[in-house]
């Protein structure tokens, strides 16, 4: 056998016996360095071209002083070097700012990070979106590992570590994903503080073949690639705060680090670490492909809507010109810019826009001819006037739902509607867009179906191929404009003023007219994945914050060609409604002074209660109406109703728009609520099957209490034929009792204290968990739902195994489409409670009947088609149930549970899913014990002996009772999240609460699939009040891994836990035990990730061990064969050598003989 044949055999054995990456090994040499960072290196507001001396807002952040740091801070960042000597730094694009270098890899690649820490404290590097083992996680927390497995958790000053990450198929982009997915990496010793200090950078993982062979590799599928971090960078959390005070404040001793204005001055509203347009120019060519990789990081205020002026984007196949971004949210957007010019990118959340979160991008023609717009449609003319009016937020004078007067003393509404010498009441001067017949502006255009619009301007409608001509007449006392979303326009028709090098009259002064021309070319219209019509908005942008709070906003509808009838209405839709959810802040209105003067207010009383006065002027409105004063929205049972929902405002404007009584379809997914943020828009379709009078409200509890409610009425109309009756199957019965218990949010503090390596008093959790100094600690009396075996309510269902993780939640109620769910409810608590479910068809109209203490009630929930998964959903959808006597106080008292509805044939007789191996339901909620029914009892039981010493309005006391919990547990005290390697897991992710309940939930070490018509890869779930998501995972990585909310305050407050993946060996030994005990094999059916790709073939999970065993056996055989062949070759080689030696000896002998002769 030749040596080449032996080499071939050894290579074949290697390829069979090992499962290495078949891609590239990409080495990155990163150093952690301290730097001085200037947030505004140009020294001015570039957006307005004003100096800091002329810009009071910019100077409040950027000018240093006696007790102000200014715009320059010491930071710590990642830098890239050419090799392990760390002497030659690799330059990066200037627009990356203080972000670390871009890391790139394809499916099958290995990334080796050679990290060296040149800074003064320990740091790490932790990635999202890639595969790693325990020695390369880069995250410090108690996980049971030790020794070399902990070396990655904290790299000390002067130390180094090599991190090994890979991109297997289970972490790579799916078929439906874009070619490259957006991820990040960051330090994770104390992640919130490390990131605030500057240690964060971008990472992309791409489909195979996307990157070229250059060094560094470049993408072959796009022409330009940009990475933008939108974040309110809180320098108060930086490890260098003391250094920055000492260096940049002229009188460091005068600084009070707890002073509110000082802290505000250190919160930099930045894009890549630049504010007020100081981001170096982002340049690109028109008609070229651009990939925008957008991500966020930060705290509860980090609700960002990135608005790209002048162009449109595609995100997951949907048309938009905005991207909503939250902490640890990653967005990949695609653009082909058409309009050349200098354009604005800004976060249009009002407070962020004012504070400088803006930048420019420049589109050059690059010698390309301008594209010819395919405009074959109509020219649609609109004549719109800005008109000043007196607006009444409560014109009917009472709550439209309860009938109570809005001015009744002590009621909720009287805060906003009681007029006095220190309150304006419910009527304000505002300005509104109004439609007219023609350019003479003499005759108003009235349409009966638009009476519900309220403060909104008229609906502007257009189809793909149309041109929109808007003649705007400003009859108001301030300069105003019209700025649209969702259409194309030249610079002369933009409506926003900024330093773009042009001088067009974009804004109409008082009693001036301006004409705007907007177009809808095919590339701006709805995509194939979009509904027939997309909801957009137009608004005045002379001063976007003050203009919109003054009232200037209206809806815009862009439809596919042929979607509108001759009357301009959408075909195939019986009714359409446009609803704006926003907190109108009258303190920010142009007419604030006029309103105070008209109210004849007492300036002395105002000065005594500034905060209360300003709060009374924040009107939580739907189309400018509070407390169900919006004219009733009437529809018929069986109608196809289009709800066009719009958001506007500031970071508090996080609205979960809930439709009681019926469900919605959003992009083919079944929902009971739609999420809105400032400058985001939703098109939702409803086909109501439940007659009655129902509420529309914001799910955020404080917004609902403040009046963000309306009423819609579903009637059985004679003109509509009844749809075929739903056939319901046999009932599933649940026996549930409300009982009062002592609940401990954190019974074991060892994990928390080990993680932060500190004493109880110095821990982040001290304020929540200590019962000293007038605080209550971690124990509270609560009411919970618990399941029993039958109607005697004597034997509780045990909470072990699959139910252990539920914690404070009630039982997981399951059903299929066509089921009747019967809930027998006994109230063993001391006050009335009920059970109300989202998504289902309840037998009673309105809110369910309450059970008095000791009473037993039976609730019946029917599960029609519209309660189950939509065409774009997973096999099951998640809902929630809770007590609804007082929905807010009941839920905070503990009465909440999960509900799952599946397609037919998914559930086994025992209730489990046949397409999943594990199911977990997790509620991420800040339990506000200040709003619990049991607060007084808890103070008496767990508070100080002298309860009079407790100040219920004290800020520390209020904060201490807000428990940032996962299923009611803090700091990894939740148990039962255990899966086995290779198992398929469904995670039902739930959120309720207030506008601060923004939760971005990150799974370490694992990725999951999110279904939205297609499968998309992610490792973070975005949750908001009233949202319920389902994500699916195949557990692949054995270990104890962290799961946590990525919002800064929530991390420190304990919203984190551990989920454990056990290895194959443990899995199959457990499966054998279960098989012997139950005599039943677990059914493993194929779902998206249920196959593992080995040797180029898709292998079902259940066959992985068999194939692995076979491969090992083959490897052993091949190894023996190779050794035998090697022995043969070695023997043959030795024999040949011996023969050569014999010949040599014989030859030498013959030579000697010849010499002798």
Swiss-Prot record:
Function of the molecule: Plasma membrane ferroxidase that mediates the extracellular conversion of ferrous/Fe(2+) iron into its ferric/Fe(3+) form. Couples ferroportin which specifically exports ferrous/Fe(2+) iron from cells to transferrin that only binds and shuttles extracellular ferric/Fe(3+) iron throughout the body. By helping iron transfer from cells to blood mainly contributes to dietary iron absorption by the intestinal epithelium and more generally regulates iron levels in the body.
Family matches, as InterPro entries: Ceruloplasmin-like_CuRO_5, Cu-oxidase-like_N, Cu-oxidase_C, Cu-oxidase_fam, Cu_oxidase_CS, Cu_oxidase_Cu_BS, Cupredoxin
List of residues binding Cu(2+) 1: 126, 1002
All copies of domain Plastocyanin-like, residue ranges: 24-206, 218-366, 370-559, 569-717, 730-902, 910-1066
Protein's name in the database: Hephaestin
Subunit annotation: Part of a complex composed of SLC40A1/ferroportin, TF/transferrin and HEPH/hephaestin that transfers iron from cells to transferrin.
CDD domains membership: CuRO_1_ceruloplasmin, CuRO_3_ceruloplasmin, CuRO_5_ceruloplasmin
Compartments where found: Basolateral cell membrane
Source taxonomy: Eukaryota, Metazoa, Chordata, Craniata, Vertebrata
Residues bearing attached sugar chains per UniProt: 49, 54, 164, 236, 587, 713, 757, 930
Topological region Extracellular: 24-1109
Family (UniProt): Belongs to the multicopper oxidase family.
Cofactor note: Binds 6 Cu cations per monomer.
PANTHER family: HEPHAESTIN, MULTI-COPPER OXIDASE
Species this chain originates from: Rattus norvegicus
Disulfide bond annotation, renumbered to this chain: 180-206, 285-366, 533-559, 636-717, 876-902
Cofactor(s) required, per the database record: Cu cation
């Amino acid at each position: 056998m030749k040596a080449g044949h032996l080499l071939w055999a050894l290579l074949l054995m290697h390829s069979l016996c090992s499962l290495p990456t078949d891609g590239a090994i990409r080495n990155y040499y990163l150093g952690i360095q301290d730097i001085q960072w200037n947030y505004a290196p140009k020294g001015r507001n570039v957006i307005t071209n004003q100096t800091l001396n002329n810009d009071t807002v910019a100077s409040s952040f950027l000018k240093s002083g006696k007790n102000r740091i200014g715009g320059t801070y010491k930071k710590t960042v990642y830098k890239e070097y050419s090799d392990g000597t760390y002497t030659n730094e690799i330059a990066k694009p200037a627009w990356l700012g203080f972000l670390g270098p871009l890391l790139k890899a394809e499916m099958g690649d290995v990334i080796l990070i050679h990290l060296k820490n040149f800074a003064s404290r320990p740091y790490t590097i932790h990635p999202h979106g890639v595969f790693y083992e325990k020695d390369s996680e880069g995250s410090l927390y108690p996980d049971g590992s030790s020794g070399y497995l902990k070396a990655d958790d904290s790299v000390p000053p002067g130390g180094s570590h090599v991190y090994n990450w890979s991109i297997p198929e289970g972490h790579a982009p799916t078929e439906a994903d874009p070619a490259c997915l957006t991820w990040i990496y960051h330090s994770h010793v104390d992640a919130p503080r490390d990131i605030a200090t500057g240690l964060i950078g971008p990472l992309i993982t791409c489909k195979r073949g996307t990157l070229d062979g250059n060094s560094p590799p470049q993408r072959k599928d796009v022409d330009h690639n940009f990475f933008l971090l939108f974040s309110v960078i809180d320098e108060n959390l930086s490890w260098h705060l003391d250094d920055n005070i000492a260096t940049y404040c002229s009188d460091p001793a005068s600084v009070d680090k707890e002073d509110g204005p000082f802290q505000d001055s250190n919160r930099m509203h930045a894009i890549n670490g630049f504010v007020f347009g100081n981001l170096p120019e982002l340049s690109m060519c028109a008609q070229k492909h651009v990939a925008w990789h957008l991500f966020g990081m930060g705290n509860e205020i980090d609700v960002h809507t990135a608005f790209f002026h002048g162009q449109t984007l595609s995100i997951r196949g949907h048309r938009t010109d905005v991207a909503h971004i939250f902490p640890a949210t990653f967005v990949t957007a695609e653009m082909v810019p058409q309009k050349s010019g200098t354009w604005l990118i800004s976060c249009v959340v009002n407070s962020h826009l004012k504070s400088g979160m803006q930048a420019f991008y420049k589109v050059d023609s690059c010698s390309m001819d301008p594209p010819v717009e395919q405009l074959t449609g109509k020219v649609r003319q609109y004549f719109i006037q800005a008109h000043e009016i007196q607006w009444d937020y409560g014109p009917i004078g009472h709550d439209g739902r309860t009938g109570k007067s809005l001015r009744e003393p002590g009621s909720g509404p009287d805060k906003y509607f009681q007029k006095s010498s220190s309150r304006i009441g419910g009527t304000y001067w505002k300005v509104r867009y109004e439609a007219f017949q023609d350019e003479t502006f003499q005759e108003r255009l009235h349409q009966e179906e638009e009476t519900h619009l309220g403060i909104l301007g008229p609906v502007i409608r257009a189809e793909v191929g149309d041109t929109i001509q808007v003649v705007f007449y400003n009859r108001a006392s301030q300069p105003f404009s019209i700025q649209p979303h969702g259409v194309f326009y030249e610079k002369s028709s933009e409506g926003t003023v900024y330093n773009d090098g042009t001088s067009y009259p974009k804004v109409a002064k008082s009693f001036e007219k301006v004409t705007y021309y907007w177009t809808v070319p095919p590339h701006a219209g709805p995509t194939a994945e979009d509904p027939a019509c997309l909801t957009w908005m137009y608004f005045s942008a002379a001063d976007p914050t003050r203009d919109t709070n003054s009232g200037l906003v209206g809806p815009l509808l862009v439809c596919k060609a042929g979607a509108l009838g001759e009357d301009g209405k959408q075909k195939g839709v019986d009714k359409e409604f446009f609803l704006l959810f926003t907190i109108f802040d009258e303190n920010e209105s142009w007419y604030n002074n006029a309103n105070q003067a008209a109210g004849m207010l007492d300036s002395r009383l105002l000065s005594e209660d500034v905060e209360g006065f300003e709060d009374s002027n924040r009107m939580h409105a739907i189309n400018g109406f509070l407390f169900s004063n919006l004219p009733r929205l009437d529809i018929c049972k069986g109608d196809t109703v289009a709800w066009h929902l719009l958001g506007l405002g500031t970071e508090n404007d996080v609205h979960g728009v809930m439709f009681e009584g019926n469900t919605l379809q959003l992009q083919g997914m079944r929902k009971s609520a739609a999420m809105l943020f400032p400058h985001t828009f939703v098109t939702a379709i409803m086909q109501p099957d439940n007659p009655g009078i129902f509420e529309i409200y914001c799910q955020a509890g404080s917004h609902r209490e403040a009046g963000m409610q309306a009423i819609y009425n579903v009637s059985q109309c004679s003109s509509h034929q009844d749809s075929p009756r739903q056939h319901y199957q046999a009932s599933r019965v649940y026996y549930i009792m409300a009982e009062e218990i002592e609940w401990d949010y954190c019974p074991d503090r060892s994990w928390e204290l080990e993680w932060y390596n500190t004493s109880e008093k110095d821990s982040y959790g001290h304020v929540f968990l200590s019962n000293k100094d007038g605080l209550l600690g971690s124990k509270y009396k609560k009411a919970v739902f618990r399941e029993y075996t039958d109607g005697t309510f004597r034997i509780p269902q045990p909470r072990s195994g699959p139910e252990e993780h539920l914690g404070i939640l009630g039982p997981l109620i399951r059903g299929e489409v066509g089921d009747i769910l019967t809930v027998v409810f006994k109230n063993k608590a001391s006050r009335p409670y009920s059970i109300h479910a989202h998504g289902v068809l309840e037998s009673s109209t309105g809110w369910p009947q309450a059970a008095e203490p000791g009473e037993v009630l039976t609730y019946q929930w029917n599960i029609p088609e519209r309660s189950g998964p939509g065409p774009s959903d997973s096999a099951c959808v998640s809902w929630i149930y809770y007590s609804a006597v007082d929905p807010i106080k009941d839920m905070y008292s503990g009465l909440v549970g999960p509900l799952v509805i599946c397609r037919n044939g998914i559930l086994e007789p025992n209730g489990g899913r046949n397409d999943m191996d594990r199911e977990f339901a997790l509620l991420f909620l800040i339990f506000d014990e200040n709003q619990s029914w049991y607060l007084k009892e808890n103070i008496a039981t767990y508070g100080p002996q002298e309860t009079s010493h407790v100040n219920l309005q004290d800020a520390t006391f209020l904060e201490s009772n807000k428990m940032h919990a996962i299923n009611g547990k803090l700091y990894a005290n939740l148990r039962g999240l255990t899966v086995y390697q290779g198992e398929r897991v469904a995670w039902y992710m739930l959120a309720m609460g207030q506008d601060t309940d923004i939760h971005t939930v990150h799974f370490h070490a694992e990725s999951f699939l999110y279904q939205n018509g297609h499968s998309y890869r992610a490792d973070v779930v975005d949750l908001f009040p009233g949202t319920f998501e389902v994500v699916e995972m195949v557990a692949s990585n054995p270990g104890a891994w962290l799961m946590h909310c990525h919002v800064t305050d929530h991390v420190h407050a304990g919203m984190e836990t551990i989920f454990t993946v056990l290895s194959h060996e443990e899995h199959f030994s457990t499966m054998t035990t279960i098989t012997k005990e139950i005599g039943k094999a677990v059914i493993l059916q194929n779902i998206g990730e249920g196959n593992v790709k080995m040797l180029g073939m898709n292998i079902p999970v259940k066959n992985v061990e068999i194939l692995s065993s076979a491969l090992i056996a083959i490897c052993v055989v091949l190894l023996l064969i190779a050794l035998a062949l090697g022995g043969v070759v070695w023997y043959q080689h030795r024999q040949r050598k011996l023969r050569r030696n014999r010949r040599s000896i014989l030859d030498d002998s013959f030579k000697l003989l010849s010499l002798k002769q």
